[in-house]
């Protein structure tokens, strides 16, 4: 699976999960053959209770989607992460995205033991999540090397922003599946060995993102994608993408849970401009890919 969408979690005005919008989003990904990642940072996982998260996983599984469903595993405590993995394995999910421990900044041995402890209780393929901007430390090369023989260590989502680190991961473990975790870096990371993209923008443009992944070296594609990335990065993810989804009526409301707020999005006037640009690009892609 080359493209996985880091799915948002839509909310109603009372801050309950908007399951109708969830269904709409997931079916839009299924239509294009894109897998989904639930309850990552884009899905505001830290703002949801365990009960809410389980309801979301159960609902997604009830839709009988013909695409992979990957579930995020929190990096807050080993007990919480282990209990969550055990709970999710009672549902027909396809794998896990395991976050590097946040805030504590462990050393190499602590990080190895953290991931190994979680991998040892799963019976699904797992993608380790390198996100130093949130975790405070990267996934070390020594960690990748030490875990490379684990049967459920499937890949890494690399959101570290370093092309060199992506190349190093592939050198340390050539059989590992590296997923680019930054929409704008897909062409460069693909050249360095990344085999897939875990995308935020594909929430709003699942078909266009699919084409972007298939044709990463088209200059026009990458320029537009970088413009979109620049826009969504003006605020903390997923503020911008929720605003875009609501503008396009892909979700009912642009509501986030605190401490995230839609009020931190300053430039909503650019929304129709970006939508029009993407519409024009989509028409060009339609001619190329058909």
Curated annotation (Swiss-Prot):
Q: Which residues form the active site?
A: 129 (proton donor/acceptor), 157 (schiff-base intermediate with substrate)
Q: Which reaction does it catalyse?
A: L-aspartate 4-semialdehyde + pyruvate = (2S,4S)-4-hydroxy-2,3,4,5-tetrahydrodipicolinate + H2O + H(+)
- Looking at the keywords, is Cytoplasm present? yes
Task: Show the InterPro entries listed in the entry.
Answer: Aldolase_TIM, DapA, DapA-like, Schiff_base-form_aldolases_AS, Schiff_base-form_aldolases_CS
Compartment(s) of residence? Cytoplasm
Q: What is its main location?
A: cytoplasm
Q: Which GO terms describe its cellular component?
A: cytosol
Q: Which Pfam families does the UniProt record give?
A: DHDPS
**What Gene3D superfamilies would the database entry show?**
Aldolase class I (3.20.20.70)
The lineage, from the top, is: Bacteria, Pseudomonadati, Chlamydiota, Chlamydiia, Chlamydiales
UniProt gene name: dapA
Q: Which organism is it from?
A: Chlamydia felis (strain Fe/C-56) (Chlamydophila felis)
Supply the alphabetized keyword list: Amino-acid biosynthesis, Cytoplasm, Diaminopimelate biosynthesis, Lyase, Lysine biosynthesis, Schiff base
| Residues of the site described as Part of a proton relay during catalysis | 41, 103
* GO MF terms held by the record: 4-hydroxy-tetrahydrodipicolinate synthase activity
According to the record's subunit comment, the protein's assembly and interactions are: Homotetramer; dimer of dimers.
Q: What is its EC number?
A: 4.3.3.7
Task: List positions binding pyruvate.
Answer: 42, 198
Record-given protein name: 4-hydroxy-tetrahydrodipicolinate synthase
The biological processes this protein is annotated with in GO are: diaminopimelate biosynthetic process; lysine biosynthetic process via diaminopimelate
């Amino acid at each position: 699976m080359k493209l996985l969408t880091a799915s948002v979690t839509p909310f109603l005005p009372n801050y309950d999960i908007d399951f109708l919008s969830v269904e709409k989003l997931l079916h839009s990904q299924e239509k294009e053959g894109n897998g989904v990642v639930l309850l990552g940072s884009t899905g505001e996982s830290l703002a949801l209770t365990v009960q809410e998260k389980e309801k979301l996983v159960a609902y997604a599984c009830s839709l009988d989607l013909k695409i992979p469903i990957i579930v995020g595993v929190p990096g807050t405590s080993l007990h919480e992460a282990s209990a969550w993995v055990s709970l999710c394995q009672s549902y027909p999910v396809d794998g896990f995205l395991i976050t590097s421990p946040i805030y504590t900044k462990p050393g190499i041995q602590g990080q190895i033991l953290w991931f190994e402890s979680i991998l040892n209780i799963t019976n699904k393929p797992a993608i380790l999540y390198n996100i130093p901007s949130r975790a405070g430390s990267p996934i070390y090369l020594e960690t990748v090397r030490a875990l490379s023989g684990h049967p459920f260590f499937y890949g890494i989502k690399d959101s570290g922003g370093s092309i060199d680190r992506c190349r190093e991961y592939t050198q340390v473990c050539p059989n590992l599946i590296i997923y680019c975790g930054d929409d704008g870096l897909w062409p460069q990371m693909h050249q360095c060995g990344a085999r897939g993209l875990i995308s935020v923008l594909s929430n709003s443009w699942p078909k266009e993102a699919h084409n972007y992944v298939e044709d990463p070296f088209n200059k026009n594609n990458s320029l537009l994608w970088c413009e979109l990335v620049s826009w969504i990065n003006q605020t903390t993810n997923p503020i911008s993408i929720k605003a875009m989804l609501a503008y396009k009526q892909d979700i009912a409301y642009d509501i986030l849970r605190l401490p995230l707020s839609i009020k931190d999005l300053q430039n909503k006037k650019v929304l129709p401009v970006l939508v029009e640009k993407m519409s024009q690009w989509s028409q060009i892609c339609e001619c190329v890919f058909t």
